[in-house]
Each structure stands twice: as C-alpha cells, then as structure tokens.
Amino acid sequence: MKTVTMKVTGLVQGVGFRWTTQMIAQDLGITGTVKNNPDGSVSIVAQGEELPLEHFIKKIKASPSVAGHVDHVDLNTVSDAEKFTRFSVVY
C-alpha cells in the first residue's frame, strides 16, 4: 500500500474536478480525500496499490474534468500516513 499527496493547479475548481476525481478513485479502488484550497488549487491524498495508483495519477495529470485543465501536479510520497477506508470529497 502506497500513499501520495498531490497539489493540483490549473482550472480545477468549479468544474467538477473533485467529483470526477472521486469517481476515478472509486473505479480504481483508491482511497483518500480530495479538497479545494483557498488559493484555487486542489489537494488530494491517494492511497492504494502501486499499479492502480499509477493509473490514478496519470488520470489526474490529464485532468479528470472535461471542463477544466491541469497545469501542474506537485506529487509527494507519504511514508507514515493514516489508513483510509474510502475516497471522499472534503468540504
């Protein structure tokens, strides 16, 4: 099990980005959270097996929302993360 954090910038708020991120995560068996940040970016904590997590990251970088676009993803691996049981949108 691997955990990563992502800070996603671009047109990622107000375009269904969090909802589509949640749908992709659920389809791939990824757990964690996604939330909007005050600076217009989106933060994601994603946890899962190596291959599904790689697919998830690729889909995020390609922008899961057709109305939005991703300019940059700051990706970090977390070694001591809490265990998530589902993927949820944090409001």
From Swiss-Prot:
UniProt protein name: Acylphosphatase
Catalysed reactions, semicolon-separated: an acyl phosphate + H2O = a carboxylate + phosphate + H(+)
Keyword Zinc-finger assigned: no
Domain Acylphosphatase-like, residue spans: 3-91
Record-linked Gene3D superfamilies: 3.30.70.100
UniProt keywords, alphabetically: Hydrolase
EC primary class: hydrolase
Gene designation: acyP
Species annotation: Lactobacillus gasseri (strain ATCC 33323 / DSM 20243 / BCRC 14619 / CIP 102991 / JCM 1131 / KCTC 3163 / NCIMB 11718 / NCTC 13722 / AM63)
